[in-house]
């Protein structure tokens, strides 16, 4: 019998040195060129412009063309975010892409996006659907503070039109395309509050790709689309997520009255309205309603709304914004951030 | 425990709050969708508010079976029993 292995004990690790705080320094967005009004999609689903607006608040959406891919849209949004942050591209040390519509099982979109930006830094995708952007912000915050990266690009991007069944009355008018990006980096003061996040995989079937890739192959099915049980999602999103949003406010050490913006995932105007009601938000707080002209762009919806509202002067630079993402998984993430 | 007429009255108030439909319009034989023109998301809001008011649990799968006001009243009465 040999003795149990013992460590040499001669080397002491150097711990990574992180920044004391992190914040979002800039946001950018890319909206595909083609505007698709409700009138263009109503015939196939035997619906009307009025019906769609009543149920979702959506008037039009953007659908990407063949030349506008998950990668190209990401690159465009990322360049804008980097410019807004006032840093050089070569200062970016990590790229996180959140998407569910990158059409390759592997590799991830992030390394390709990084390459297109001239970067060779760490780059990986996360799959957290409509909550992906808030997951990315939380990861980036931890990476900056943990010392594993300086400036981090967080990109939420979707080309959901590739995964939408135009004849599905519950999703055809909801899903759309676009990309939003944020640069997270070191800060002297706290800029990203504690993230409240979690999952409920017991409800994984409420929003999902209708058939697995194996079913598509083995049963000779058509290209799969994403389906949704609208009522169940509505209940979970409104009555399940309002308390999560409240916990994010509490964890940040502020009150709802301190907020300068509420930026919920743009899932459905009815969800947004009901959530505002549940949260009892003061009426003067601007609420993202980008869904009207953008529809539901999943991971891209929050940064796209943020970019637009900042650009149009609806919300203040340096203000406090509550953002919450929730979606397929089911998964969710919420945090209060200082607006860039 | 609420009686059937109390459940109907409470339900009518919840429907009124969500949709603006007059409480007198919310009658037992009315269909939520066909007669009262209540869409699926409003129906879910009504369901959640009814759960809270009557202290019952109405599962998502059950909601599609609640076609008329009577269906809802009966389900709530049964769930309370």
List each model region and its residues:
Chain B
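Short coil/turn motifs that cap or connect alpha-helices
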Residues: 22, 57-59
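Core alpha-helical elements of the protein kinase catalytic domain
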Residues: 13, 48-49
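C-terminal structural segments of small proteins and small subunits
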Residues: 57, 64, 70-78
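Two-component histidine kinase catalytic core, primarily the HATPase_c
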Residues: 42
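N-terminal helix-turn-helix DNA-binding core of bacterial DNA-binding proteins
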Residues: 25, 29-36
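Thiotemplate assembly-line natural product biosynthesis machinery
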Residues: 2-24, 77-80
């Amino acid at each position: 019998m040999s003795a149990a292995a013992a460590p040499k004990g001669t080397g002491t690790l150097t711990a990574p040195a992180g920044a004391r705080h992190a914040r979002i320094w800039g946001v950018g967005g890319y909206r595909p060129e083609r505007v698709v009004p409700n009138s263009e999609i109503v015939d196939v689903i035997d619906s009307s412009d009025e019906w769609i607006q009543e149920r979702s608040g959506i008037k039009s959406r953007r659908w990407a063309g063949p030349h506008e891919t998950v990668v190209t849209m990401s690159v465009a949004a990322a360049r804008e975010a980097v410019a807004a942050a006032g840093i050089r591209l070569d200062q970016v040390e990590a790229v996180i892409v959140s998407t569910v519509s990158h059409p390759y099982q592997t590799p991830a979109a992030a390394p390709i996006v990084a390459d297109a930006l001239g970067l060779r830094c760490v780059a990986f995708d996360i799959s957290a659907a409509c909550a992906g952007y808030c997951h990315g912000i939380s990861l980036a915050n931890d990476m900056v503070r943990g010392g594993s990266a300086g400036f981090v690009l967080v990109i939420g991007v979707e080309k959901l039109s590739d995964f939408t069944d135009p004849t599905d009355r519950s999703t055809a008018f909801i899903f759309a395309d676009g990309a939003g990006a944020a640069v997270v980096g070191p800060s002297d003061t706290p800029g990203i509050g504690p993230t409240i996040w979690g999952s409920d995989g017991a409800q994984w079937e409420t929003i999902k790709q209708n058939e697995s890739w194996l079913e598509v192959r083995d049963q000779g099915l058509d290209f799969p689309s994403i389906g949704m049980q609208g009522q169940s999602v509505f209940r979970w999103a409104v009555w399940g997520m309002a308390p999560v949003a409240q916990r994010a406010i509490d964890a940040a050490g502020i009150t709802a009255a301190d907020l300068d913006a509420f930026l919920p995932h743009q899932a459905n105007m009815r969800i947004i309205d009901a959530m505002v009601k549940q949260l009892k938000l003061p009426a003067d707080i601007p609420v993202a309603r980008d869904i009207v002209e953008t529809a539901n762009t999943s991971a891209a919806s929050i940064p796209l709304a943020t970019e637009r509202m900042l650009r149009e002067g609806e919300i203040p630079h340096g203000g406090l914004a509550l953002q919450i993402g929730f979606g397929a998984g089911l998964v969710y993430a919420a945090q209060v951030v200082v607006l860039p | 425990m609420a009686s059937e007429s109390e459940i109907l009255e409470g339900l009518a108030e919840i429907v009124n709050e969500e949709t603006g439909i007059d409480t007198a319009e919310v009658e037992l034989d009315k269909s939520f969708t066909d007669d009262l023109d209540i869409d699926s998301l409003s129906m879910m809001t009504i369901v959640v508010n009814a759960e809270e008011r009557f202290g019952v649990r109405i599962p998502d799968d059950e909601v599609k079976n609640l076609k008329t006001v009577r269906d809802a009243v009966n389900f709530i009465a049964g769930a309370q029993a």
